[in-house]
Amino acid sequence: LMFDPRVLRQGKSVVSMSVDGVSAGALAVRAAFVFARTRDSAVTHDFSTRPTVPEPDACPPMPENARRVAPAFASHFELRKAGGAFPVSGAREPEFLFWTRHQDAQGVNPMVAMVALADLLPPAAMACFDKPAPVSSVTWTFDLLHGVPPKGEWFLQRSFSRQSAEGYSMQDMEVWDEDRRLVLWGRQSVALFA
């Protein structure tokens, strides 16, 4: 994969960039990034509400049979179910609530580690599957909400499908640190082949 980064616009506080990933002469991925410096503001509020769940030590680890069918990269993380459903459990509510942490993120930029963690949970609509079936991300956008790295090693992740119809699911994702701060918010559209 060859990457071609480009600055699209650079202002005093914000830089907009695009990156194309090309493989065998064909576009494989196109990403857009916006980097912003923190700024003083008279307007400050936070209406986000962290789900009420037990602490990580009180939550069960991911069962071994679920770990066996998870993608290989998931072996680099620890997951503990804090609420919601398990993937492919035939649940009515398309919501995952898991405490997650890296097995080893030594030497990795904390913001890069956070993005990897945010991509860990499967699409929330998979909670409603009664048997395994393919899924494919169509879009994924996220905002890192603080200019400083998140605190702690455990992060509470919530993924909830807002709507699923005609072969696609639209979901929201939240990641909370140990200080109960919302540190990442995302939205994803997913193609469902079930």
Show which residues each predicted segment covers.
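Terminal targeting signals and extreme-terminal segments of soluble enzymes
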Residues: 1-194
